[in-house]
Amino acid sequence: MPGIKVHPNESFDEAYRKFKKQVDRNLIVTEVRARRFFEPMTEIRKKQKISARKKMLKRLYMLRRYESRL
């Protein structure tokens, strides 16, 4: 869990901004949203398969685009 040290001369807004930045860096909000509902392993594998396919197609597109310029 992120925590910050608030200095005596620091305003609430600055401390809040620091805290939000740490939360965003640690991906806490996205993880909580992902874990909000139970997801069976079959669904997780399905999503991983889809994302792997998207990544592969993107790389293939970039490779073909690069080769066409040569």
From Swiss-Prot:
- The yes or no answer to whether the keyword Oxidoreductase is present is no
Biological process (GO) annotations held by this record are: translation
**InterPro entries for this protein:** Ribosomal_bS21, Ribosomal_bS21_sf
Q: Which domain of life is it from?
A: Bacteria
Instruction: Provide the family line.
Output: Belongs to the bacterial ribosomal protein bS21 family.
Q: Which NCBIfam families match?
A: S21p
HAMAP family tied to this protein: Ribosomal_bS21 (MF_00358)
User: By what name is this protein known?
Assistant: Small ribosomal subunit protein bS21
- To which species is this protein native? Campylobacter curvus (strain 525.92)
Gene that specifies this protein: rpsU
